[in-house]
Amino acid sequence: MDKTSINKVVLAYSGGLDTSIIVKWLQDTYQCEVVTFTADIGQGEEVEPARVKAEAAGVKEIYIEDLREEFARNFVFPMFRANAIYEGEYLLGTSIARPLISKRLVEIAKQVGADAISHGATGKGNDQVRFELNAYALNADIQVIAPWREWDLSSRESLMDYAQKHGIEIDYKKQSKKSPYSMDANLLHISYEGNILEDPWTEPEEDMWRWTLSPENAPDKVEYVEMTFKKGDIIAINGKVMSPASVMEDLNKRAGAHGIGRDDIVENRFVGMKSRGCYETPSGTVMLKARRAMESLTLDRAAAHLKDELMPKYAEMVYNGFWFAPEREMLQAAIDKTQETVSGVVRLKFYKGNVTVVGRQSKNSLFSEKIVTFENDDGIYNQRDAAGFIKLNALRLCLNTIK
């Protein structure tokens, strides 16, 4: 990349150590103006301090946006209509946040006339791929600056030294008290990587977890929760109508208090290596359980089975950074078609780390008590018909035995 061609860069900025250093590094290395963009996607931290830090770094254009509702409504909820899980365990909490951030970076870059966007993802992880693939899908001509792939800073200590050398104000007391884990949080989850978790045999310490009680310490009392669905999306909890973001915030607190949503996973990164991560996803765990219960009542068998076959591919697209790809949008259209009848109420029971479905009802239910009953069905179903059904399905099996 020709550094002289870069006059203005939009940086995905948190105000933390890494991105604070990136501001100065971009200014010095590219001799460019830096515009910062900070998104509130439910990470649970104040975002306004990022404005103060950016101003102190000489940034003139600062964007801070509350994107919680857009994140929940246009990204998380559509993904959950697919019941997407990566490698059978990961609910894609980090993966699904990247397309929205990329989208706003590209939009702001166009708005302010920037030549490039920049992010603080490392050269080893998935996020660099996700940020950039999603950005290129929206603007093929956008230039991307990834400092971790360019500079020679390789550790937290080297970052601290750089900050001290260049007069970047860092709260060293806060840094010393900072979690030893690499963390990422949003409305859907909080993730933990690094430190002792790099040994897949080592159990995480209990004080690592922030959103959930341990199941052992969760209340000895059951909580029942009713969730109302409309066309595949949750619209109310216990009869109270809520926005998508409010649904997730409510479930994070409610389910987290019962120790629901912890997971410890070794996953295959898109870049080729395996990594271990621990996740707290209270709302996602509950939503997935409730959604599958609602679909079990309202979806046709063949449609449900085909949807389940497509789900791993959909999850892989989200994980790898292909949210804006035509194949994901094609699958989304098919999935959304299946959700037209997925409306009704699911009743759940929360208790000590477990979420159990205990009831479901829908005006679109395909469940027939009259047909399935063990009692007299008044001749609706003729059991003699099963003999021909079995014989036809057994034909190929019988042929294998004929010599």
Curated annotation (Swiss-Prot):
* Sites where the protein binds L-aspartate: 122, 126-127
Q: Name one GO cellular component term.
A: cytoplasm
A Pfam family in this protein? Answer: Arginosuc_synth
Pathway info: Amino-acid biosynthesis; L-arginine biosynthesis; L-arginine from L-ornithine and carbamoyl phosphate: step 2/3
Q: What UniProt keywords are attached to this protein's entry? A: Amino-acid biosynthesis, Arginine biosynthesis, ATP-binding, Cytoplasm, Ligase, Nucleotide-binding
- Which terms does the UniProt entry file under GO BP? argininosuccinate metabolic process; L-arginine biosynthetic process; urea cycle
Alphabetized InterPro entries for the sequence? Arginosuc_syn_C, Arginosuc_syn_N, Arginosuc_synth, Arginosuc_synth_CS, Arginosuc_synth_type_1_subfam, AS_cat/multimer_dom_body, Rossmann-like_a/b/a_fold
Give binding positions for L-citrulline. 90, 95, 126, 130, 182, 191, 267, 279
Where in the cell does this protein reside? Cytoplasm
| Binding annotation for ATP | 12-20, 39, 120
Origin superkingdom:
Bacteria
Q: Which GO terms of the molecular function aspect are on file?
A: argininosuccinate synthase activity; ATP binding
Q: How does it assemble?
A: Homotetramer.
The record's comment on protein family reads: Belongs to the argininosuccinate synthase family. Type 1 subfamily.
**Protein name (database record):** Argininosuccinate synthase
Q: Which organism is it from?
A: Vesicomyosocius okutanii subsp. Calyptogena okutanii (strain HA)
